């Protein structure tokens, strides 16, 4: 019996002869599996940009629809107190603004806005410190994002969307988180993210967190079979070759699933 391996770096397949007997090892495993029509992209007439080892089925795909909402009410004093406590921010110097409240604590400013955005800026030494390096920046940002957003997110979870070091400014990092629903990313509003943090020289200097809450709706949405979606999806390119189901939340009360190229 031969063992096969695939190296994603160079796209090559490799084989190695073994003393194993297929009738003893492989056949018992596959004997209970019935073919279901699944096939690889390279076996079908699909755009060449599709990853050739993407596995397709001819079945329609269904996914849950989620109700979405802004979970924070500015008229709910308990909610505001809980949020400020989660961010270790004082509520002593509160000032109303057109679309929410501004809290000032020393050289730090926190704005809580009607649409669910929480915006922080420090013009001084900053209250939120981070360990050195990119991993330290991610950890500090995660603690704040999780403390503020996770208790209000319902069935959504936060995940790390990106983390980058600034090429021009030393010790400056940008960390971005997104929401996900049942393992599928949520594209929130126009730019997709749930929270973005700026960390400079071991201090969180700025962040914006968009508070959203998600709960499963009673209906499901039917999506095109993956093969048809691949043929129709113009977003598939050499740099984005894999299909995945994601959710779009435009702020209109529902997060709906759709095919996307990643």
Residue ranges of predicted features:
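Helix N-terminus capping/helix-initiation residues
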Residues: 21-22, 183, 225
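Short, non-transmembrane alpha-helical segments in secretory-pathway proteins
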Residues: 75-83, 128-169, 216-254
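Preferential activation on post-signal-peptide N-terminal prodomains/segments
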Residues: 1-136, 143-147
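C-terminal, well-structured catalytic/ligand-binding subdomain of enzymes
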Residues: 192-228
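Exposed beta-strand-loop-beta-strand "reactive/processing" segments of non-cytosolic proteins
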Residues: 1, 75-122, 154-201, 209, ...
């Amino acid at each position: 019996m031969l063992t096969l391996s695939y190296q994603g770096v160079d796209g090559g397949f490799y084989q190695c002869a073994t003393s194993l007997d297929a009738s003893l090892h492989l056949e018992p495993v596959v004997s209970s599996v019935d073919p279901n029509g699944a096939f690889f992209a390279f076996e079908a007439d699909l755009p060449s940009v599709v990853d050739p080892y993407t596995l397709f089925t001819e079945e329609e795909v269904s996914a849950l629809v989620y109700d979405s909402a802004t979970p924070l009410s500015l008229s709910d004093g308990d909610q505001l107190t809980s949020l400020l406590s989660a961010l270790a921010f004082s509520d002593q110097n509160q000032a109303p603004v057109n679309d929410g409240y501004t809290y000032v604590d020393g050289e730090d400013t926190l704005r809580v806005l009607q649409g669910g955005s929480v915006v922080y800026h420090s013009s001084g030494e900053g209250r939120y410190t981070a360990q050195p390096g990119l991993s330290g920046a991610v950890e500090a940002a995660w603690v704040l994002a999780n403390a503020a957003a996770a208790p209000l997110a319902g069935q959504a979870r936060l995940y790390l969307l990106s983390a980058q070091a600034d090429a021009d400014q030393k010790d400056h990092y940008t960390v971005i988180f997104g929401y996900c629903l049942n393992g599928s990313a949520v594209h929130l509003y126009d730019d997709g993210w749930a929270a973005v943090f700026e960390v400079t020289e071991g201090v969180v200097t700025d962040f914006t967190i968009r508070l959203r809450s998600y709960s499963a709706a009673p209906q499901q949405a039917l999506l095109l079979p993956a093969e048809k979606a691949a043929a129709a999806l113009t977003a598939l390119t050499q740099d984005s070759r894999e299909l995945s189901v994601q959710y779009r939340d435009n702020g209109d009360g529902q997060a709906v699933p759709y095919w996307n190229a990643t």
